[in-house]
Amino acid sequence: MAGCCCLSAEEKESQRISAEIERQLRRDKKDARRELKLLLLGTGESGKSTFIKQMRIIHGSGYSDEDRKGFTKLVYQNIFTAMQAMIRAMDTLRIQYMCEQNKENAQIIREVEVDKVTALSRDQVAAIKQLWLDPGIQECYDRRREYQLSDSAKYYLTDIERIAMPSFVPTQQDVLRVRVPTTGIIEYPFDLENIIFRMVDVGGQRSERRKWIHCFESVTSIIFLVALSEYDQVLAECDNENRMEESKALFRTIITYPWFLNSSVILFLNKKDLLEEKIMYSHLISYFPEYTGPKQDVKAARDFILKLYQDQNPDKEKVIYSHFTCATDTENIRFVFAAVKDTILQLNLREFNLV
């Protein structure tokens, strides 16, 4: 140590800089450890993008008036997409319009180029209103499992009066319900208790899944979303394949990937509100003959579907943390994510020097 006294000013400065660099590297390493990567997975329309929007509302800056205005044309486009889907299904399902005038109204809506829509004309609004009130369209809506229709169709169409007003600015709920298929990878980082949660949302449609592999490094937790209401629906990409069977097979593939051996798995059984509605008229046993519970029983249906997914786990040592959710309900997601955050931190105590 005596030699230190003989160091030149230049050497002392060099040592100081080296020590500072060492300290910074240690800090950087610690900071890197204080980031959690949560990968949102699930088939198309399971609610992943809605969940990301909720994180922005609950843990981020939310949606300002200006942000919400930016969703206006998407709301309009969602309305036309839904009405056009029902008009096409009227032909396919051979349902008659009760009101003769609605054949003309259907033609008005049919001619709209959805991706070019930026406003609603008076004629279009009148046509949409009359069509939605037609008993034929209502029958077509009730048979929506036989074709592809967005979950938000009824929400927007029953509120067309408000949406058609010139002063219309989408509400937070309107924003949550906008359907835009995710293509590519969306990352949303937010800070919670000095830890960065980096949430990664990838497209759920089959064509998007090949991109997932780029996200598989250093994943702390998988959050896999299941749409409970899809037990009686077919895939958009393949109309003779049950959506829940596809989701179940995907879940099994994901949890057995070698990349995720050390990642915790959290299962969100989403759209519980839609299941409660649907189970009253669409019986689970018609699609899953192994179901032995009573008809029109929400709890029995939920428990059966949860077990379907739990049974995909071949590693009985690995715990699957499950929650029933409604991604469009901010309070429900606030409550559920608080529990998820605690679970994730609990599982990563040592890494974050919390013990």
Curated annotation (Swiss-Prot):
Q: Could you tell me which residues belong to the region G4 motif?
A: 266-273
Q: G-alpha domain spans which residues?
A: 34-355
Question: Does Metal-binding count among this protein's keywords?
Answer: yes
* Entries under Gene3D superfamilies matching the protein: GI Alpha 1, domain 2-like (1.10.400.10), P-loop containing nucleotide triphosphate hydrolases (3.40.50.300)
Which Pfam families does the entry mention?
Answer: G-alpha (PF00503)
Query: Which residue ranges does the record annotate as region G5 motif?
Result: 325-330
GO MF annotation list: G protein-coupled receptor binding; G-protein beta/gamma-subunit complex binding; GTP binding; GTPase activity; metal ion binding
Please list every transmembrane segment annotated in the UniProt record, as residue ranges: none
Record's keyword terms, sorted: GTP-binding, Magnesium, Metal-binding, Nucleotide-binding, Transducer
Q: Which GO terms describe its biological process?
A: G protein-coupled receptor signaling pathway
Q: Which residues bind Mg(2+)?
A: 49, 182
Q: Which domain of life is it from?
A: Eukaryota
What would be one Gene Ontology cellular-component term for the protein? Answer: heterotrimeric G-protein complex
InterPro entries in the cross-refs: Gprotein_alpha_Q (IPR000654), Gprotein_alpha_su (IPR001019), GproteinA_insert (IPR011025), P-loop_NTPase (IPR027417)
Matches recorded under SUPFAM superfamilies: P-loop containing nucleoside triphosphate hydrolases (SSF52540), Transducin (alpha subunit), insertion domain (SSF47895)
- Binding positions (GTP): 42-49, 176-182, 201-205, 270-273, 327
Q: Where is this region: G3 motif?
A: 197-206
Query: Is Protein transport included in the keywords of this UniProt record?
Result: no
**What residue spans carry the region label G2 motif?**
174-182
Q: Which PANTHER family match?
A: GTP-BINDING PROTEIN ALPHA SUBUNIT, GUANINE NUCLEOTIDE-BINDING PROTEIN SUBUNIT ALPHA-14
- Please report which protein family the annotation says this sequence is part of: Belongs to the G-alpha family. G(q) subfamily.
Assembly and partners are described as:
G proteins are composed of 3 units; alpha, beta and gamma. The alpha chain contains the guanine nucleotide binding site.
Q: What does this protein do?
A: Guanine nucleotide-binding proteins (G proteins) are involved as modulators or transducers in various transmembrane signaling systems.
Q: List the protein's name.
A: Guanine nucleotide-binding protein subunit alpha-14
